[in-house]
Amino acid sequence: MIKGSCLCRAIRFEAGHVTFFGHCHCSMCRKAHGAAFATLAGVPAEEFRFITGADQVKLYESSPGNHRAFCSVCGSNAPAKSSDSKMFYIPAGLFDDDPGARPTVHMFVGSKAPWWEIKDDLRQFAEYPAE
């Protein structure tokens, strides 16, 4: 299991294998993370559990049906369940351990920051990656 935590460690979690790993350039992720993009790892919901701090996770509905999670103590982004409840999406900076996976895609490059240039060879998608 991969362990992770927020900045203050009030929220601690463990996760199973990463099935999605990518950089999201949508304007909401850029605003929420205060960066050019958010690097997110997806794990199946049944392979995720909070060790401590589930009660410290607060949600903000950034768009209908989509919630962003954050720690009510330190304000760090926190793992959030997908709108269909099948996955947990974890901001990759929260991992304490090497997740054993690496990003494979850039998504929402159609709305990326104009001041950021993508210089790697990862696949790029204007919106969500094709499945």
Where are these regions (language model features)?
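A short Gly-Trp-Pro
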Residues: M1-E131
